């Protein structure tokens, strides 16, 4: 009952109180690293991050801020993301920082994180089933560069725990350099060859390796191990410099750390060749004595999450077992002390209730997710709008929901809807065309093509067809193929129920523009050999092109039938046949 009252009060507040307009600022942001590096403001960078590092030892909130400013895992909004995406240009900025401030712990941490993230981009996220041998070798070379940078970072003052945390995870995924144990037990490894596997592969496939190395800035000029520091904080190494060793390094610097354990545990799961039993033993060990009861509960619940994150409720045959699983998830979502545990349970429950077509339970879970500030993916975002238009019309609820979910989200549909409604001055937003267009421009890229399609089409599903064409036109102005295609389909609708006047000539123009953009994108893709694996975004170029060429064929057929000029009619008929052929390729 108390939970029900809390939910009702929260929904009442969303309906009747207008929160301040937000601007998309990142939650854990410490500094604009690329911007400050371009301006060579190295002292300011060091001051900001040294202060954040010092504060990270004093409270969990400060520790969390520092951790998420530097860690990219399930965190697309950390401070280094644009620097890593810049590839060799970003690396060059980091190297300039190191040359200007050779004892800057954060200049070295930046390089460690650069190579960490680039290693993951070579591997790809998920199960890495499409990762090639050359990509794995490049990832290992990045990992080697990361370890060198991490040792330098840890050797500097103030003492750096984050570099060891990143290295712990990477050593589980990419292994450890062959020379590392030798170095840690006291040998001098300066001058030893690095990247030997990459050099060997390069002899057999130079074009492939050169193309892959160019993504990150890997270079055979760095193929010899430099003189490495021996930070005094490094513990004794017993023939294994892997995940556990680097966790020990981290805890030697920061004995009461929590967030590094929150990342460490998932990489001890069976999917990473570990076991739940090993995790339970670890949580009972003295390493975890400093944890609070709530923190220990959260780490234990990661085992539940590992068991259930990929489980679909309809895969469970027994109704009694289904009820038990749902009840446990509900309990976690209500009772878990740490927000991330509640988030995991709520994310699972909304998929569960969607699969069961239990709309009442789904809507209740979505509302609770809003209260808990869970970020909604594109699918559940639009589900929520559908329910809210039914239950909370003519209130401030939609405005508050749009603001909350467009903030620091990796999903494009919330940004599109936020931008459109602010541009148009609807659903509680004051009309601000400039700010609205800025939100739309942030996702005005072909990789979001499928998101624009859903955002436009779902206006009909919402019962708001009057917004279909205005948003499609804004998308067309940004050369979004899906928007152009949808406008073409409306103009090519002969049934008098289209949102635009029937005119196959206008429709043809939209279809041709969409096809031209998609063909250009396909040509670009084919002209770029040895691309990295795309872990998301729009990839259905061929299927969409087939459908568009079919629509172009239909337009030409209709235009030929109404064309009195024989020569023009013949040209339309030829275009009809050509596009029907392309539609079946």
Locations of regions flagged by a protein language model:
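Hydrophobic/aromatic packing residues within the alpha-helices of TPR/SEL1-like helical repeat arrays
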Residues: 94, 143, 150, 247, ...
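Canonical positions in the second alpha-helix
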Residues: 97, 153, 249-250, 286, ...
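Short helix-capping/linker turns of helical repeat alpha-solenoids
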Residues: 103-104, 159, 256-257, 341, ...
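TPR alpha-solenoid repeat register
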Residues: 107, 162-163, 260, 296, ...
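Short coil/linker segments at helix-helix boundaries
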Residues: 31, 35-101, 113-253, 261-292, ...
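TPR/TPR-like alpha-solenoid signature
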Residues: 109, 116, 165, 262, ...
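Compositionally biased, long intrinsically disordered regions
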Residues: 1-45
């Amino acid at each position: 009952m108390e939970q029900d009252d809390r939910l009702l009060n929260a929904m009442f507040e969303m309906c009747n109180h207008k929160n301040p307009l937000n601007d998309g600022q990142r939650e854990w942001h410490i500094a604009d690293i690329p911007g400050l590096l371009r301006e060579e403001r190295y002292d300011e960078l060091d001051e900001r991050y040294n202060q954040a590092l010092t504060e990270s030892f004093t409270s969990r909130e400060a520790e969390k801020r520092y951790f998420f400013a530097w860690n990219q895992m399930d965190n697309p909004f950390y401070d280094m993301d644009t620097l890593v995406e810049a590839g060799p240009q970003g690396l060059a900025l980091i190297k300039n920082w190191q040359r200007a401030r050779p004892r800057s712990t954060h200049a070295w941490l930046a390089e460690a994180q650069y190579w960490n993230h680039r290693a993951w981009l070579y591997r790809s996220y998920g199960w890495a089933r499409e990762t090639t041998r050359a990509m794995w070798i490049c990832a290992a070379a990045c990992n080697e560069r990361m370890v060198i940078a991490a040792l330098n970072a840890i050797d500097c003052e103030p003492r750096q725990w984050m570099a060891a945390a990143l290295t712990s995870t990477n050593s589980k995924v990419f292994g450890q350099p062959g020379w590392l144990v030798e170095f840690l037990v006291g040998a001098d490894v300066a001058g030893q060859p690095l990247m030997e596997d990459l050099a060997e592969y390069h002899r057999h496939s130079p074009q492939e390796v050169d193309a892959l190395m160019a993504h990150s800035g890997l270079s055979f000029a760095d193929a010899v191990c430099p003189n490495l520091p021996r930070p005094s904080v490094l513990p004794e190494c017993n023939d294994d410099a892997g995940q556990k060793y680097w966790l020990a390094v981290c805890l030697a610097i920061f004995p009461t750390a929590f967030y590094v354990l929150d990342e460490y545990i998932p990489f001890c799961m069976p999917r990473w060749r570990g076991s739940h039993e090993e995790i339970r033993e670890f949580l009972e060990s003295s390493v975890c004595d400093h944890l609070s009861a709530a923190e220990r509960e959260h780490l234990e619940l990661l085992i539940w999450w590992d068991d259930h994150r990929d489980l679909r409720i309809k895969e469970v045959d027994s109704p009694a077992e289904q009820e038990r699983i749902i009840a446990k998830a509900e309990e976690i979502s209500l009772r878990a002390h740490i927000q991330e545990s509640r988030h995991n349970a709520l994310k699972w429950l909304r998929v569960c209730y969607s699969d069961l077509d239990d709309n009442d339970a789904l809507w209740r879970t979505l509302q609770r997710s809003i209260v808990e500030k869970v970020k909604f993916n594109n699918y559940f975002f639009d589900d929520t709008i559908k329910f809210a238009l039914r239950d909370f019309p003519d209130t401030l609820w939609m405005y508050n929901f749009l603001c909350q979910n467009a903030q620091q989200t990796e999903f494009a549909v919330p940004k599109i809807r936020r931008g459109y409604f602010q541009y148009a001055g609807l659903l509680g937003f004051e009309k601000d065309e400039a700010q609205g267009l800025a939100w739309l421009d942030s996702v005005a890229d072909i990789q979001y093509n499928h998101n624009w399609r859903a955002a436009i089409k779902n206006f009909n599903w919402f019962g708001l067809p009057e917004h279909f064409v205005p948003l499609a036109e804004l998308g067309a102005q940004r050369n979004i193929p899906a928007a152009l295609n949808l406008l073409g389909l409306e103009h090519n609708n002969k049934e008098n129920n289209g949102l635009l006047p029937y005119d196959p000539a206008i429709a043809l123009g939209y279809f041709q523009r969409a096809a031209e953009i998609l063909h250009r994108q396909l040509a670009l893709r084919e002209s770029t050999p040895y691309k990295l694996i795309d872990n998301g975004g729009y990839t259905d170029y061929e299927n969409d092109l087939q459908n568009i060429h079919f629509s172009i064929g239909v337009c030409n057929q209709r235009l030929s039938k109404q064309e009195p000029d024989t020569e023009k009619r013949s040209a339309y008929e030829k275009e009809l046949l050509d596009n029907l052929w392309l539609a079946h390729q």
